[in-house]
C-alpha cells in the first residue's frame, strides 16, 4: 500500500494545491472553505480546532468518544492532504495562513507566527483583527473557562485553536501504537475536547476540526549521546 501511495504522490501530488477549496484537498484550502461557510452561516462565525499530530486511525477513536459523550453531535467527515514534509511548522502554518509554505519561508521552522498569519488571512477577508482569535497549547483544564478567556461571544467571528495534547502524548510514547490509542482514549474520556466543541456550538460557531499531520509507529535509534 505504501509503495502504491508513494507512486501516486509522485504523479499527482503537485496538482492538488491549485484545486478549488470547496472540498479542501490540501490543508491550506481549509481557511478559504471557512470563508464560504461564514458567508452561508446564519451567525457568520466559524471556529477551527487543529489537533496537532492526530492520525486517521486515532481520529476514529476520538470520534467515537465525542459521539458517545454528546449523542446529539452531528459530523461530516472528509480527508485532506497535509503538506510534505508533514511537519508541524509546515502544515500548521499552511492551515492558519491559507497559503502554501513558499509564502512563509522566514518562519518555516517554527510555529510562532501562526496567530499573526491567522489574523492576516481574515483581515484579507474584510474582518477586523478584533474579530479574530487564536490560541495554542490547549488540551488540559476547563475548556469552557479557557475558551471564555480567548473569545468574546457574539463579537469574535473567526476562532483558531490548537490542541497539542496528542502531540505531547506522541513524543513521550514508548509503548507504540497500542499505547497511543490507549492514552488518547483516556484523554478524550476526560471530556476536554467534547466540552470545547459543545461550547463553541452553543456560542453559535460552525466548528471544523482537523489535524496538521498524523503519526506512525517506527523503530528509533535510541537516545543519541
Tell me the role of every PLM-derived stretch.
Residues 1-225:
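Feature captures the catalytic ectodomains and active-site-proximal regions of enzymes
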Amino acid at each position: 500500500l505504501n509503495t502504491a501511495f508513494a507512486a501516486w504522490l509522485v504523479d499527482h501530488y503537485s496538482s492538488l494545491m491549485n484545486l478549488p477549496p470547496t472540498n479542501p484537498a490540501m490543508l491550506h484550502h481549509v481557511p478559504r472553505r471557512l470563508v464560504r461557510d461564514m458567508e452561508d452561516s446564519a451567525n457568520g462565525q466559524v471556529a477551527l480546532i487543529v489537533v496537532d499530530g492526530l492520525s486517521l486511525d486515532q481520529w476514529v477513536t476520538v470520534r467515537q468518544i465525542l459521539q458517545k459523550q454528546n449523542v446529539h453531535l452531528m459530523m461530516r467527515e472528509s480527508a485532506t492532504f497535509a503538506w510534505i514534509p508533514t511537519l508541524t511548522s509546515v502544515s500548521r502554518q499552511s492551515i492558519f495562513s491559507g497559503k502554501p509554505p513558499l509564502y512563509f519561508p522566514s518562519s518555516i521552522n517554527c510555529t510562532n507566527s501562526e496567530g499573526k498569519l491567522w489574523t492576516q488571512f481574515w483581515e484579507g477577508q474584510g474582518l477586523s483583527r478584533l474579530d479574530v482569535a487564536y490560541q495554542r497549547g490547549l488540551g488540559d483544564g476547563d475548556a469552557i473557562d479557557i475558551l471564555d478567556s480567548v473569545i468574546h461571544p457574539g463579537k469574535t467571528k473567526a476562532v483558531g485553536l490548537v490542541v497539542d495534547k496528542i502531540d505531547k502524548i506522541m513524543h513521550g510514547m514508548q509503548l507504540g501504537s497500542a499505547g497511543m490509542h490507549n492514552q488518547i482514549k483516556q484523554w478524550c474520556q476526560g471530556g476536554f475536547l467534547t466540552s470545547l466543541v459543545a461550547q463553541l456550538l452553543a456560542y453559535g460557531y460552525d466548528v471544523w476540526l482537523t489535524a496538521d499531520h498524523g503519526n506512525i509507529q517506527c523503530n528509533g535509534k535510541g537516545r543519541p549521546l
